[in-house]
Amino acid sequence: MSGDNPVGRLVVLAGPSAVGKSTVVHRLREEIEDLYFSVSMTTRAPRPGERDGVDYFFVSPEEFQSKIDAGEMLEWADIHGGLQRSGTPAGPVEAALLAGRPVLVEVDLVGARNVASLKPESETVFLAPPSWEVLVERLTGRGTEPEDVITRRLETAKNELTAQHEFKHVVVNEDVEKAVSDIKEILVGRR
């Protein structure tokens, strides 16, 4: 790409566990040809079917800390009561933005706040459930976490839902097609 390309648009997506972020992100990646999706780094174990370097970079807590110490993370946080750490490697995001590509970063609430603080030009999007009951049903229906983890995730979700007013955009994920369309407009639309 030539040096006179406009800098790409950075969209920061957050929302509670089981709101449908992964589904929406997957669809956006299919529909937006030049989209750069930032692969997060995490200390949690992979879920069935997840691939290292594709879904997440799965690392040890020690390796994660070394990335922080080296200044290689755009944002990071201890999440779910300190059970794990998650964050966004900075280098690939910066390179994609400079190349003029739309960039999608999926993070938790703390990560969204941190990126918005560092990059106030970013478009922050909160993906909300249609109701609390739907969110509980989605989270408990996964069958991938034990009861104590589900309880902790629901506590985290309550906190996250009260912070949605901090975001520039709130998209309710009642209909996946509409949610994808709304976020696609934010990513590549010329508002």
Swiss-Prot record:
ATP binds at G15, P16, S17, A18, V19, G20, K21, S22. It catalyses: GMP + ATP = GDP + ADP. Its main location: cytoplasm. It comes from the Bacteria. GO terms for molecular function: ATP binding; guanylate kinase activity. Its EC number is 2.7.4.8. Keywords: ATP-binding, Cytoplasm, Kinase, Nucleotide-binding, Transferase. Residues 8-188 form the Guanylate kinase-like domain. One of its GO terms (cellular component) is cytosol. Transmembrane segments: none annotated. It is found in: Cytoplasm. InterPro entries: GK/Ca_channel_bsu (IPR008145), Guanylate_kin-like_dom (IPR008144), Guanylate_kinase (IPR017665), Guanylate_kinase_CS (IPR020590), P-loop_NTPase (IPR027417). It is an enzyme of class 2 (transferase). Belongs to the guanylate kinase family. Essential for recycling GMP and indirectly, cGMP. PANTHER family: GUANYLATE KINASE (PTHR23117:SF13), GUANYLATE KINASE-RELATED (PTHR23117). HAMAP family: Guanylate_kinase. This is Guanylate kinase. It comes from Corynebacterium diphtheriae (strain ATCC 700971 / NCTC 13129 / Biotype gravis). The gene is gmk.
